[in-house]
């Protein structure tokens, strides 16, 4: 294709980056072009032209020295490359491409507010060409609106696989626009080729802006610039601060209200509501655990004197006493709430869970100690005495609430064993079989229950 283009007098810029053309008039057709018919001469390369859009903006950057940011992931250009084409065949298919070529063989650095050469340029990476996404398209499509390369990205990653344009930092480049007549990008041969470039689009590739003037131009004209967003946020913060600022009259009014007694009274209803909250009396919920002696003395588990008792494990009384006490308690009223404020100085016994004296008597029987009169048995599960000012000694704690009969050893012959014949089929004839036994050891062969257990 290159040879074919040379025969016709054209140059392929993407294949020969050292050759470029600034405008369509630089193309010199060969003498053989005179044999082309007049109809085809309307669409010769001499008739194809291009103009740069946003030329004023590009000129502002060009005067200060345009800089383009390159990153590893790729960064879009600003100003964007945007051109307009004319002179194309309305129905012919064209492809539009762009590539970047170095301006010289030097590396640059920013020194004393100006760019200066700092050595020889690095080897140029493989030439990459960006194809416009609309390619191929008819000449009417390309000439209808300006052509923008907004998705083109620049990168410094030499191993890039995303199709971005690879450039070196601190090197100067310029973009070139190629118009190729072709119906298919891959199969059909390329036809006429026209190359355009504009001096205003020259730039220096950098990883960070060096010239402050370029930074200001980017902020002022690029709404997506980071500095522009930071400036907007600062303006918003200033607006918020202005709205929060109050006039002197409002501040004085606020100070007068805080000094007035109304500010203190406004919180008073909250305190009264907290104090008036009622607390459920635990004696109502746990009536069975309140002894008769406590009810008579006006001491409930809710009182301050009984906090320690409530935290101890309560020892229930026997089932018979519990039944009698529950009936007796149901006919009585609870103690007066005025008794709850009993001073702690009148508490003469510690908060220790104790058991009735009947259990003490049973314990004495086991150890062979003579028991006290059974009439002295108390029905309360907690022994709290408030009649005498003398401090009483602690009673022993026992972990059983059963009667003394469980500890008594039965005499010989007290139980009359009853047994049944294991193989007797007539249930009506079953009866007790009397046996004479001399000791307890002979009972082990007979059942103690008058019925069979499965």
Curated annotation (Swiss-Prot):
Compartment list: Nucleus
GO terms (BP aspect): cell fate specification; positive regulation of DNA-templated transcription
Pfam families: T-box (PF00907)
Family matches, as InterPro entries: p53-like_TF_DNA-bd_sf (IPR008967), T-box_DNA-bd (IPR046360), T-box_sf (IPR036960), TF_T-box (IPR001699), TF_T-box_CS (IPR018186)
UniProt DNA-binding residue ranges: 57-230
Polar residues bias spans: 308-325
Record field: compositional bias (Basic and acidic residues): 229-241
Keyword Translocase applies: no
GO MF entry, a single one: DNA-binding transcription factor activity, RNA polymerase II-specific
Protein name stated in the entry: T-box protein VegT
Taxon lineage: Eukaryota, Metazoa, Chordata, Craniata, Vertebrata
């Amino acid at each position: 294709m290159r040879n074919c283009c040379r025969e016709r007098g054209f140059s392929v810029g993407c294949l020969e980056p050292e050759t470029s053309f600034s405008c369509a008039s630089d193309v010199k057709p060969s003498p053989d072009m005179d044999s082309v018919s007049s109809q085809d001469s309307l669409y010769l390369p001499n008739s194809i032209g291009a103009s740069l859009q946003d030329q004023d903006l590009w000129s502002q950057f060009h005067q200060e020295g345009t800089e383009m940011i390159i990153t590893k992931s790729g960064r879009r250009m600003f100003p964007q490359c945007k051109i307009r084409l004319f002179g194309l065949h309305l129905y012919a298919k064209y492809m539009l491409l762009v590539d970047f070529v170095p301006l010289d063989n030097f590396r640059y650095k920013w020194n004393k507010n100006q760019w200066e050469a700092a050595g020889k340029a690095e080897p140029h990476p493989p030439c990459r060409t960006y194809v416009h996404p609309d390619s191929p398209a008819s000449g009417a499509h390309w000439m209808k609106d300006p052509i923008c390369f907004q998705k083109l990205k620049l990168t410094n990653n030499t191993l890039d696989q995303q199709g971005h344009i690879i450039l070196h930092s601190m090197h100067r480049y310029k973009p070139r626009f190629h118009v190729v007549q072709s119906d298919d990008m891959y199969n059909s041969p390329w036809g006429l080729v026209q190359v355009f470039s504009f001096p205003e689009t020259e730039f220096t590739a950098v990883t960070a802006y060096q010239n402050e003037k370029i930074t200001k131009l980017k902020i002022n004209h690029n709404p997506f610039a980071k500095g522009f967003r930071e400036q907007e946020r600062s303006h918003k913060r200033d607006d918020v601060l202005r709205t929060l600022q109050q006039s002197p009259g409002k501040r004085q009014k606020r100070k007068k209200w805080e000094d007035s007694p109304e500010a203190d009274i406004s919180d008073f209803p909250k305190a009264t509501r907290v104090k008036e909250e009622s607390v459920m009396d635990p004696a109502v919920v746990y009536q069975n655990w309140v002894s008769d002696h406590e009810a008579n003395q006006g001491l409930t588990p809710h009182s301050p004197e009984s906090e320690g008792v409530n935290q101890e494990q309560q020892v229930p009384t026997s089932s018979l006493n519990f039944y009698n006490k529950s009936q007796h308690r149901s006919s009585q009223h609870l103690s007066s709430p005025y008794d709850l404020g009993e001073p702690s100085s009148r508490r003469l016994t510690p908060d220790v869970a104790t058991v009735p004296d009947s259990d003490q008597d049973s314990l004495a029987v086991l150890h062979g100690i003579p028991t006290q009169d059974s009439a002295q048995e108390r029905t309360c599960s907690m022994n709290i005495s408030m009649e005498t000012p003398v401090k009483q000694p602690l009673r022993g704690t026992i972990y059983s609430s059963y009667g003394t009969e469980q500890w008594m050893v039965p005499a010989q012959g007290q139980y009359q064993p009853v047994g049944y014949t294991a193989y007797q089929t007539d249930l009506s004839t079953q009866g007790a079989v009397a046996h004479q036994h001399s000791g307890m050891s002979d009972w082990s062969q007979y059942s103690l229950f008058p019925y069979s257990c499965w």
